[in-house]
A protein has these predicted regions:
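Acidic/histidine-enriched segments that form metal/cofactor-coordinating
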Residues: 2-10, 89-187
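His/Glu-rich zincin catalytic helix
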Residues: 1-91, 124
Length: 187
């Protein structure tokens, strides 16, 4: 329930950053791998879980074919040259871990959530997924059909359609940020 006071929306909300708020602003350590790739590490001791993000400039704006970035990210977990998608899922499950991949506008992110004590066991698997993903054709075709059906269902929902077209109206349909998928893109 509100207090009955109507805020003045012409003014920004007042919020001061206090000294104790500054403690919540974590600053990453910057390291470099032997190949020169930067690593940004935020330590939060006391947590039993880690989150590892592998981030590459490989998002939607770089794709040459509609939905290529989206399906590439989705397929990362579906197998490698040496490990099937079922084996990957079983190994992650065994260690109480979760792996997600997403294609954003400017980047593709592979994220691992895992108990800290098993991180060392899972890093070789993550490296294998990133380096030798196999993109099985049968799994891709099944996923494309499923995603097309989901698209057709969502395309009848006003809120979803509005979100889809907002960027197109803002940037224009020719801009990478303004592109909107159509059903034929799933074929």
């Amino acid at each position: 329930m509100t207090s009955g006071i109507i805020p003045d929306r012409s003014l920004p909300p007042v919020h001061e950053i206090r000294a104790d708020d500054a403690a919540l602003m974590l600053r990453p350590e910057t390291l470099a791998l032997s190949n020169g790739l930067p690593v940004y590490l935020i330590r939060q001791e006391g947590l039993g879980v880690i989150k590892l993000d592998i981030v590459l400039p490989a998002g939607v704006r770089y794709q040459q074919v509609p939905l290529a970035a989206y399906f590439t990210a989705r397929m990362l977990r579906e197998g490698t040259q040496d490990t099937s998608g079922d084996q990957i899922a079983a190994r992650l499950d065994y260690f109480g871990s979760y792996l997600e991949a997403s294609a954003e506008r400017d980047r593709t992110v592979l994220s691992l959530y895992a108990p800290r004590r098993f991180a060392g066991e899972l890093l070789p698997l993550i490296a294998e997924i990133w380096a030798t993903a196999s993109f099985p054709e049968d799994v891709l075709e099944t996923d494309k059909k499923h995603q097309k059906q989901e698209y057709l269902v969502n395309d009848r929902r006003v809120g979803w359609v509005a979100r889809q077209h907002f960027a197109s109206l803002l940037y224009g349909p020719a801009h990478p940020y303004g592109s909107v998928a159509v059903p034929e893109d799933f074929d």
